[in-house]
């Protein structure tokens, strides 16, 4: 059975579960193509639709998972799905729409949550939370996943310890809005106990590398910065920022303003840890949101350089014209497509300049690399701070090796 993942780590988690389920139930025939889909932008949708069509033309049966196949965590009504993606309708008999989880009671987040099929993987995804109540005005994902649920601490700890017992060296803490862990509603940032969870992971596990997936800034307190000063947390932090302009953040309904971004990014850059100069900051940014002026856009560009954001997930605003409307698509003053493309190009260019300077500052340093791919006499992997490295000889897959970085082996 062939499979492909689009976009996020939560999709990766559930894709692993789905693969294990299909294998257990003997539904993993060679003529099946399993795809985990994403709806973050119209461009993302078009990519997986093209991939599906390619496999349908090969006479494959296609199992569709992820946000593209769901409504509130359940499999989408087929008539609605084919109304959104009419190009797939001629192949209706070969398409199966899947719910979020193959075996989970939607009212009980802990039921069947442990990810099967990862025993041979050294990097494991640990989901701690699902769903979001924030209703950002650009977001379609909120209508796709199931209800906001928090995974119990004892289950999280048990799974991390199991990962290490099976040879794992790194876990990735993930979720849809993971920093809201333990809040009754993700809009109640004061109820979050995310930093407490991270502290307990340090106390109750010994796995050497802990990576935190994308987090929203409004949940982060001084206690969070104290906890992640521990070097077991890799020096790589990914923030869902979207904009640095206050009027745009308000229009997006993000729940924070630029002063909170300044606080969070400044404290991350000043963490009291021995590898402070190696801290990598990644960010999700949307350019050309409705009402965004050139001044608003420039504020964001300047901030990328000011805070040394080393990797951008930059997207032009998508109004989701494929019938699934979001609140922001109804706002006046939509930015013309040519301006959207140009602003995003400029933003990516600035991000690449910052990234290049950051990577070059590591030349000559010895870094630990987790080997993720071994092929044709070469090994590929990532450093603790997520610099991608290619080494011209083969190491054991999922081993951690010391590598002196230079302009030849850093492939970003």
Regions found by a protein language model. Name each.
Residues 327-412:
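Terminal RNA-binding accessory module
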Residues 1-98:
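Cofactor-cradling patches in redox/metallo enzymes
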Residues 42-51, 147-149, 248-253:
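Glycine/threonine-rich flexible loop motifs
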Residues 181-202, 251-258, 319-353:
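Radical SAM enzyme [4Fe-4S]-AdoMet core and its adjacent flexible, acidic
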Residues 10-20, 139-155, 184, 331:
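Iron-sulfur (Fe-S) cluster-binding segments and ferredoxin-like electron-carrier domains
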Residues 62-65, 70-73, 165-295, 305:
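Conserved SAM/AdoMet-binding glycine-rich loop
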Residues 1-12, 109-138, 142, 157, ...:
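N-terminal pre-triad scaffold of radical SAM enzymes
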